[in-house]
Amino acid sequence: MTSEVIKFPQFPEFTIHISLFINVSSENITTIKSNLISATDNDHNKYDYCFLNTKYIISKEHLFQSIYKSLLNYTSKLGLSTRNLKSEIIYNLSPINNVGDALKRFGISEDCPNCIVIKIINNNNKENSEETKISEKVTTDLKEIIDGELIELNDQYIFENFIDLAKFRKLYKLNDVVDLNKEDNLQGRLTRLAIGACILRGY
């Protein structure tokens, strides 16, 4: 099992590696958080990832939209709303116009044993020209950092195992919008509503 690799046609120069780890111990998560804060220049590349908990990510589309919006800001005159591309991804998952709140809700957390890890690589860098080797290296490096099980990221597993619908609907203010008993494609419906809430954030 290796990381899932995606590209957006609008950003051919970037390759996105996405990994899902489950059953990660709280001690391991604490260590990762500590190293993210205290990493020296020599350790920077080792922890140059976006670490997310899985509590409020409803689908892959929800995640991809956040990555896409972050790359759009990164490459345009709009610029980032946060310090870097990694925190921008976290911020763009949130419907709340507060970076600190987004980091708290969506960042890696000891109370969630599952984490999604994202690595964005600029292919214009000659060192990153061989994608297969890069993908294998990303997976190998992450397994050295994370003591958990790497599994496939798929919508059914996300929806059935990670999401607390009551908390999700409360965060995205969807309690009066969606009838859980009448929606045939509930995950798709909630995904679109969550993305809409993020797009309209601050208005």
UniProtKB/Swiss-Prot annotation:
InterPro entries: CGI121/TPRKB, CGI121/TPRKB_sf
Cysteine disulfide links: none
Protein location: Nucleus; Chromosome, Telomere
Alphabetical UniProt keywords: Activator, Chromosome, Nucleus, Telomere, Transcription, Transcription regulation, tRNA processing
Superkingdom field: Eukaryota
Record has Metal-binding as a keyword: no
One biological process term in Gene Ontology: tRNA threonylcarbamoyladenosine modification
Gene3D superfamilies: CGI121/TPRKB
Cellular component aspect of the GO annotation: chromosome, telomeric region; cytosol; EKC/KEOPS complex; nucleus
Function in brief: Component of the EKC/KEOPS complex that is required for the formation of a threonylcarbamoyl group on adenosine at position 37 (t(6)A37) in tRNAs that read codons beginning with adenine. The complex is probably involved in the transfer of the threonylcarbamoyl moiety of threonylcarbamoyl-AMP (TC-AMP) to the N6 group of A37. CGI121 acts as an allosteric effector that regulates the t(6)A activity of the complex. The EKC/KEOPS complex also promotes both telomere uncapping and telomere elongation. The complex is required for efficient recruitment of transcriptional coactivators.
Family indicated by similarity: Belongs to the CGI121/TPRKB family.
Subunit structure: Component of the EKC/KEOPS complex composed of at least BUD32, CGI121, GON7, KAE1 and PCC1; the whole complex dimerizes.
Protein name as annotated: EKC/KEOPS complex subunit CGI121
